[in-house]
Amino acid sequence: MYKYLQVGKIVNTFGLKGEVKVIPLTDSPDRFSELNYVLLEDNLSQKLTIERYRVKDNIVIMKFREISSIDEALKLKNRFLVIERERAKKLPEDTYFICDIIGLEVYDLDGRKLGKVKDVLQTGSNDVYICQSYIGKKDLLIPALKDIVKEVNIEQGYMKIKVIEGLLD
């Protein structure tokens, strides 16, 4: 399990006084209201205190206390913001962080190894796990539904699925 979780990616500056545009990597951009600070993924010792933020067109405009000019803000471009896992919102039962799903081995209910999760597609209605197949050339697309995903064990690194017609084609 990862010790830090990504919550946003800085994609540009905003204005001249050090604000930045952040693509939120959380389900709710309002999540930032609960955070006093974030860290830079590539420099965990650099703490950025959130002075204020606002959401505009699914982008978060954020001001950090430590950044006061456009030149300083430019140095943050294309960097990821993270928080410590223990500061993350508690997830409902049977809900997982994407970073914990990626890398899981996928087995059918008979114990046959089918593949490994390499990405998660967020469709709106339900997530879809994209798995590198061990049994064919095409990736497996596994809907993240209780009828299909029967067990997820993050600690042991696997999930078990019920294979439905067409899933392995």
Curated annotation (Swiss-Prot):
Per UniProt, what is one Pfam family of this protein? RimM
Q: Domain of life, per the record?
A: Bacteria
Q: Give the record's GO biological process terms.
A: ribosomal small subunit biogenesis; rRNA processing
- Which UniProt key words apply to this protein? Chaperone, Cytoplasm, Ribosome biogenesis, rRNA processing
Domain PRC barrel per the UniProt entry, residue ranges: 93-167
- An example Gene Ontology CC term for this record: cytoplasm
The entry sums up its family as follows: Belongs to the RimM family.
Q: What is known of its domains?
A: The PRC barrel domain binds ribosomal protein uS19.
Q: Give the function comment from the record.
A: An accessory protein needed during the final step in the assembly of 30S ribosomal subunit, possibly for assembly of the head region. Essential for efficient processing of 16S rRNA. May be needed both before and after RbfA during the maturation of 16S rRNA. It has affinity for free ribosomal 30S subunits but not for 70S ribosomes.
Subunit relationships: Binds ribosomal protein uS19.
Record-given protein name: Ribosome maturation factor RimM
Write the gene name: rimM
